[in-house]
């Protein structure tokens, strides 16, 4: 008699091996398993890390192979290989998989997709030369943990025809939205993502530092600035940047800019950021040559 507690999975046709059980790799494993993909293998830096990720799939289902990275040669065959390692390890993983492929005969070659935002499918060339379909899928979402919800996320996809089809299917099944870009544009695309996410965090940290110089503690400064940031994001949801811009540069307030520049003289990093972003803000507004000249002279 079957175990009544064991979760019954619908039949699936796609087996998946995930190499790199970090935050994104584990989040993908959990999300794909929830959509009835069969997680064949999980590879992490250590077997213990892989087992930890596997337990998040289904505590009652221990069928997934767990491997330490050093034992990649024992990896079982699968239809799809997702390489979710750091960027500087992807080429090595591709070479190892290609070497492993030499010892196996397949009627149908698998697909390999990596999840780097900056690298194209070209980094998987060793696999392409073995007849694999190769590509990349990258989620435009901050993955803060293994249970990060991927539903509704935008994903960039590039690669060969089969890889594009597989990538689009995965994104659709995960409740996301996909768009394709040229392989050579991956670095520019990823830089745009960094500008709108990571660099915003860095800029927010500079603003915190400035308020702390005013005598506020960091926690209070954060509480004060977060609603302002949230209101700006809300404006950008419905308006073009030129219409969403408010404040000193939108008004062309010359005297206030003078006061800001004077106050920032002792903070070189903040001063340089203020100058560069101020000039960009002026491009979104009516021309204010006096302010531009002031910023250029700093």
Which residues fall in each region the model found?
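Internal alpha-helical scaffold of NAD(P)-dependent oxidoreductase catalytic cores
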Residues: 51-56, 60, 127-133, 148-238
């Amino acid at each position: 008699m079957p175990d009544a507690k064991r979760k019954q999975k619908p039949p699936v046709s796609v087996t998946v091996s995930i190499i790199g059980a970090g935050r994104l790799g584990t989040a993908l494993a959990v999300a794909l398993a929830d959509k009835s993909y069969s997680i064949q293998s999980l590879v992490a830096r250590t077997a213990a890390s892989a087992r930890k990720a596997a337990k998040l799939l289904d505590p009652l289902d221990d069928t997934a192979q767990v491997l330490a990275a050093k034992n990649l040669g024992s990896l079982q065959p699968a239809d799809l290989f997702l390489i979710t390692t750091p960027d500087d390890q992807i080429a090595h993983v591709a070479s190892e998989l290609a070497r492993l492929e030499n010892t196996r005969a397949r009627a149908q070659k698998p697909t390999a997709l990596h999840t780097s935002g900056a690298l194209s499918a070209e980094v998987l060339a060793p696999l392409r030369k073995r007849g694999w379909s190769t590509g990349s899928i990258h989620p435009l979402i901050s993955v803060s943990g293994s249970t990060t919800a991927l539903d509704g996320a935008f994903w960039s996809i590039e690669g060969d025809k089969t890889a594009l089809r597989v990538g689009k299917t995965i994104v659709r099944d995960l409740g996301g939205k996909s768009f394709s870009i040229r392989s050579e544009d991956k670095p520019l695309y990823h830089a745009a993502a960094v500008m709108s996410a990571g660099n915003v965090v860095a800029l927010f940290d500079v603003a915190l530092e400035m308020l702390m110089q005013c005598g506020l503690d960091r926690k209070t400064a954060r509480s004060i600035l977060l609603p302002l940031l949230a209101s700006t994001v809300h404006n950008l949801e419905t308006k073009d940047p030129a219409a969403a811009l408010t404040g000193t540069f939108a008004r062309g307030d010359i005297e206030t800019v003078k006061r800001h520049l004077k106050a920032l003289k002792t903070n070189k990093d903040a001063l340089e950021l203020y100058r560069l972003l101020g000039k960009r803000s002026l491009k979104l507004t009516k021309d204010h040559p006096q302010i531009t000249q002031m910023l250029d002279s700093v």
